C-alpha cells in the first residue's frame, strides 16, 4: 500500500494519470493499462440479468399457442404427408454432384490415368532396343600392333634377385618374336629419363642395364640369322659388357 500524507508521503508524489512510460522510454510491452471493450460496463450486465429473470408474459404464451396450432393441425399433417420427402438415399441418388465434387468420379479417373501410364511404359520398354557394340574399341590385336611386335609377347617378370634374363624363341616369322623378361629398379634406371612401357616409348628412351646377364639361352640365338634388331639393343656401352651386349 502507498503511504498517505499522514503516513509521510510527500505532496505531489502520487500517481499521475496519463504519465506512463512509452515503449521507447522503457515500458515493457503488455504492461499498459487495460481498458474494457464494452462501453456499457455494468449497465449492460444488469440488462441481461433483467431479461433472464423476467417472467413469461401472456403475449409469449399466445405466440407459443399459435405456433403449436400451425405445426400440429390436421390439415398441415395431410399436406405434409402428401408431399412427403423421398428417403435420403433416393434423394442422394437423384441429385448428382458435379464431377469436381464427386469423389468416386475422381478416383475412377485416377485409376484410368495410372493404367494408361503403365501401358505407355510397357510399350516403351518393348520398343527400346539396347545397342551394344559387338567389339570393344581397343582390341588385343590393336594393342600388339601398336607396340611393333606382330604376335610378340612382352612380359615383365619381377624376380627376387633382380636379375635380367633375355630368353629368345626360335620362331622365325616376318618379325623375330622375343620374350623379354626383365625388371627395372631404381639402380637399373636412368634418373634423367622416366622409363614407361608405353607404345614406342621404350624404343626411343634407352635405359642402363647392369653388366650381369644370363647368357645360357641367348648363345643359341646368336647363330640364327636375324632380320631386325631387338628393342633390347639400346644399351649404353660399358667397358666390361661390350662383348656380352653384342650377343643379345
UniProtKB/Swiss-Prot annotation:
Question: Region labeled Disordered — which residues?
Answer: 1-127, 219-248
Give the range the annotation lists for the signal sequence: none
Instruction: Name a single GO cellular component.
Output: cytosol
Q: Where is the composition biased (Basic residues)?
A: 12-21
Recall the GO molecular function terms of this protein's record: minor groove of adenine-thymine-rich DNA binding
Q: Biased composition, Basic and acidic residues: where in the chain?
A: 37-71
Per the record, the GO terms for biological process are:
negative regulation of transcription by RNA polymerase II
Q: Where is the composition biased (Low complexity)?
A: 72-100, 111-127
Question: Where is the region 3 X 5 AA repeats of G-R-K-P-G?
Answer: 8-30
UniProt DNA-binding residue ranges:
1-36
UniProt superkingdom? Eukaryota
The record describes its quaternary structure and partners as: Binds as a dimer or higher oligomer.
User: What role is this protein assigned?
Assistant: DNA-binding protein that recognizes oligo(A).oligo(T) tracts (A.T DNA). Can bind to any 11 bp sequence in which 10 bases conform to an uninterrupted oligo(A).oligo(T) tract.
What protein does this entry describe? Answer: Oligo(A)/oligo(T)-binding protein
Q: Please name the taxonomic classification of the source.
A: Eukaryota, Fungi, Dikarya, Ascomycota, Saccharomycotina
